[in-house]
Design a protein with these regions (language model features):
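Mitochondrial intermembrane space
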Residues: 31-213
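Positively charged n-region of N-terminal signal peptides that target proteins for export
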Residues: 1-5
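Signal peptide processing junction and immediate N-terminal pro/mature segment
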Residues: 21-35
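Bacterial N-terminal signal peptides
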Residues: 10-21
Length: 213
């Protein structure tokens, strides 16, 4: 009798515990993002909160850049009507040189973070490009560094980050690293041989050069 009563008491306690824990777990799982598509919102903002995103935009402008919203497209080597708009979007900071008109693009969270990122480290390291690159040297160099700017692998269709109203670069080759940090492929490639495009990012990235150059 005592064992039956004890068992009933334990089962009741377990049921009450589940009732208390389960709603809390569901609430946490749902998150606080009020956008229609939380996955796209997280992808677009990178690691930045909404407040930090606003600060990053202001920081970009303060450093002489221009906030540049871009959408991912596949098949950009084809006719524009055949381009395939993919999910998500990204905000870049575009730096354009007043002297020669050259540009460099940095994804906003990569620009604004004070922590190390693979893209910033790759920029600072100036790793020499190997002699094994064929075709597009910037895309090849991006792959050499451990990033990728390829849409669907090596193919004739192509792809990139698009801003149709941009007067300089409608389609951008952005080198994205495994930590999602991003700098454009040509900016990285030119910098590897000591050529500054757009702006010297030593004076723009909040994460400072660890190599002491």
């Amino acid at each position: 009798m005592k064992r039956s009563l004890l068992a009933a008491t334990i089962l009741t306690c377990i049921a009450l515990a589940i009732a208390v824990i389960l709603p809390a777990a569901v609430t946490v799982q749902a998150g606080n993002d009020k956008t229609a598509n939380p996955a796209d919102a997280a992808l677009s903002k990178g690691a930045l909160s909404q407040a930090d995103l606003s600060k990053a935009e202001a920081y970009c402008v303060k450093k002489g850049g221009e906030v540049n919203d871009r959408d991912p497209y596949y098949n950009t080597n084809g006719d524009e009507q055949d381009w395939l708009r993919l999910s998500g979007w990204r905000q870049f900071c575009k730096f354009k040189s007043n002297k020669d008109g050259s540009r460099i693009y940095v994804e906003l969270s990569t620009l604004y973070t004070e922590k190390p990122t693979l893209a910033a480290l790759a920029y600072y390291a100036e790793v020499p490009i190997t002699g094994s690159c064929n075709g597009n040297p910037a895309s090849c160099y991006c792959s050499q560094l451990g990033g990728s700017d390829l849409f669907g692998g090596i193919n004739a269709a192509g792809g990139g980050w698009v801003k149709k109203s941009d007067p300089d670069d409608i389609v951008l080759e952005a080198c994205i690293f495994p930590d999602m940090s991003t700098i454009d492929s040509w900016g990285l490639t030119y910098h590897s041989v000591g050529i500054i495009r757009g702006k010297n990012l030593d004076n723009a990235l909040r994460y400072k050069n660890p190599y002491g150059q």
